[in-house]
Amino acid sequence: LWTGNTGSLSTFVTSSSQSAASLNYYTNVYNEAAGDVQYAVAYGHKFGSGSVSLDNDDSSTLASKATYAQYKQLLLDQGDDKFKFYSGSTEDGHESDDIYIINVARARYKEKMDAGNWSVILSGSNQTFNFIDNSGKKFSDSVGKAGRIFNVGSGSLNLGTESEATISSLIDSNGRGYGKFYPDQGIIVLNPTAIHQTIGTSVDSGSNSGASVYEGITREGQNQFLLHEAIRGGGDFQARRTENVSTSHYFIRA
């Protein structure tokens, strides 16, 4: 999937030339300096936490609120107001006000990402954890306007062995789901609360002391950098793409 037709990405570079304004919404990640964009990371909050409020700056664009609304419009079905993840054993039982986004560049995944064949290691102050989807048999029980939907869990693809992929858990220690995977869109949506409950974080959380992400309203938090650092620290993002290629056969009788 990645540039050079490699299946594993181990170098994660951001660009100093990306505009400051766009960094309030997302961060492009490259395979090398002056390389190709591999994916973008973003943070969204339904009510705009993590961005400067209009009370503090009447020219604020409420970047985190706009990002949440953008992906809600792209991925959620009509009538769904929030992203939903596991709550204990109940699928979609937890409504999340905030989300992390990994949006793979279209030039990389082309038609769709290969469900069951991606993994990303996230590193934090606790330790490193590997995350995959729970597709297993390559089909999904859940299909929405954005196509197939799978849950994200900690686990292993067990590459190099005869074993199938294994899911260790779909939830954190408090019972909150890790995220969703939309292979037809090349998008992974993660639950920041569950992710940081598991991997931890040592990043300054600003005015919201003790939190995993900055939830204040006096400055632009650019919380997507927390996710970027977790991916960079993990040092391995594996993924494949898949395409349906149509062929036509003509039989000529002489």
Q: Predicted segment positions?
A:
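Long, position-biased, composition-driven segments near the start of the mature protein
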Residues: 1-254
